[in-house]
């Protein structure tokens, strides 16, 4: 197994969190009363129980580096995630950033911000 780091994100309700991410191709790898791990290909997200979380006040976030950001964005839209400036869940379209990369954003039902970054910028870095 390769060494890796995974984000630890809050979930108000594991059933709801799993249902949301399963629509985006993630599957449950592990789950008990206080912890859940979801995986989609090489992407892994870990969730801890946080039933009292206020999604509007959440400051949790992480970055997902994707080989095909445009396809993941299309998948989010195809399952009904709205492109809007407020509320949750929501998606923000991919845009070229000043730093040279392409980035979109997904806010999940618990108010967690997932920055979606196209991998191309890191292709030449080893």
Curated annotation (Swiss-Prot):
<dbReference type="InterPro" id="IPR037523">
    <property type="entry name" value="VOC"/>
</dbReference>
<dbReference type="InterPro" id="IPR029068">
    <property type="entry name" value="Glyas_Bleomycin-R_OHBP_Dase"/>
</dbReference>
<dbReference type="GO" id="GO:0046677">
    <property type="term" value="P:response to antibiotic"/>
</dbReference>
<dbReference type="InterPro" id="IPR004360">
    <property type="entry name" value="Glyas_Fos-R_dOase_dom"/>
</dbReference>
<feature type="domain" description="VOC">
    <location>
        <begin position="1"/>
        <end position="119"/>
    </location>
</feature>
<comment type="function">
    <text>Binding protein with a strong affinity to the bleomycin family of antibiotics. Binds to CL990; an antimitotic-antibiotic compound.</text>
</comment>
<keyword id="KW-0814">Transposable element</keyword>
<dbReference type="InterPro" id="IPR000335">
    <property type="entry name" value="Bleomycin-R"/>
</dbReference>
<keyword id="KW-0046">Antibiotic resistance</keyword>
<comment type="similarity">
    <text>Belongs to the bleomycin resistance protein family.</text>
</comment>
<protein>
    <recommendedName>
        <fullName>Bleomycin resistance protein</fullName>
    </recommendedName>
</protein>
<dbReference type="Pfam" id="PF00903">
    <property type="entry name" value="Glyoxalase"/>
</dbReference>
């Amino acid at each position: 197994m390769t060494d890796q780091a995974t984000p630890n994100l809050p979930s108000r309700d594991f059933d709801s969190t799993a249902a949301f991410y399963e629509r985006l191709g993630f599957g449950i790898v592990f789950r008990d009363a206080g912890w859940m791990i979801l995986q989609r290909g090489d992407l892994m997200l870990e969730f801890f129980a946080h039933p009292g979380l206020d999604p509007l006040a959440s400051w949790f976030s992480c970055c997902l580096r994707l080989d095909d950001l445009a396809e993941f964005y299309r998948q989010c839209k195809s399952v009904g995630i709205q492109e809007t400036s407020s509320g949750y869940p929501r998606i923000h379209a991919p845009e070229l950033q000043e730093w040279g990369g392409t980035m979109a954003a997904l806010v999940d039902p618990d108010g967690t911000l997932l920055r979606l970054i196209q991998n191309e910028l890191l292709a030449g870095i080893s």
